Amino acid sequence: VFLFSLGMEKVVACSYKRPNALYRLICFPWAGGGTSRLARWGRLFSSSIEVYSVRLPGRECRINEPFAQDMTSVVNEITSVLLKDLQEKPFAFFGHSFGSYISFAVALHLKEKYGLEPIHLFISGAHAPHSEAFLPIKRLHDVEDEAIIAHTKILGGTPFELLQSEDLRKNLILTLKEDLRVLQTFSFEKAERNIPLSCDITCFDGSEDTAHDLEAWNGVTSGDVSIYKLPGGHFYLLEPSNEIFLTKHITICLEYADL
């Protein structure tokens, strides 16, 4: 019998359980995001890959829990819940936007503390964490609610009806602000001699999104870094044709990682 522990149920959504999968793909959603969209990717992968989608406090079944205060507590919680699973079989991380920074912070912690590393890191819509371009994003949480709504509309990806309903809108703004507050507490200074990771990194970006400093991801790994631009804006990954490209590409990377 394949049972999720209570901590696991709380922190991870796994819509398509595959206990015999060869690999696990751990997905980290965007700021203000829940687990459902990336958890559904499970159906697009073959039986060799099981998909987990990470859930932070303050949303979905964790709506009554206080939001995370900082990146350290986010990383510690995710690590403690997932550690056993990550030691069990090869795993990769996929993060979009805010989720990219969390996935990188978790990867750093796993490497430093446990000598564990993803076989591949998939980054989407995000500057490298030591890039100058990343700094303005860290200041976003202080802005007015209306500015956040305007920013959300420009980015797209948020259903219009969410922004129409007063309660849903308030909740979305609050969650976004809290997620951005977590981002403020994260800093990664790249030491000249110490390249923290050795896995390959693939960076994806929407061709019409604000350009991200993807080249700088070369500075955090001794592995290869590849860059792909897919049609669309910041939420290009929600387009069905792009979802198919992403899941096929991720599958190839995971299946060849062991060769």
Kindly give the residue locations of the regions a language model identified:
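Hydrophobic alpha-helical signal peptides and transmembrane signal-/tail-anchor segments
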Residues: 1-5
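Domain-scale detector for complete catalytic domains at protein termini or as standalone homologs
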Residues: 6-94, 101-259
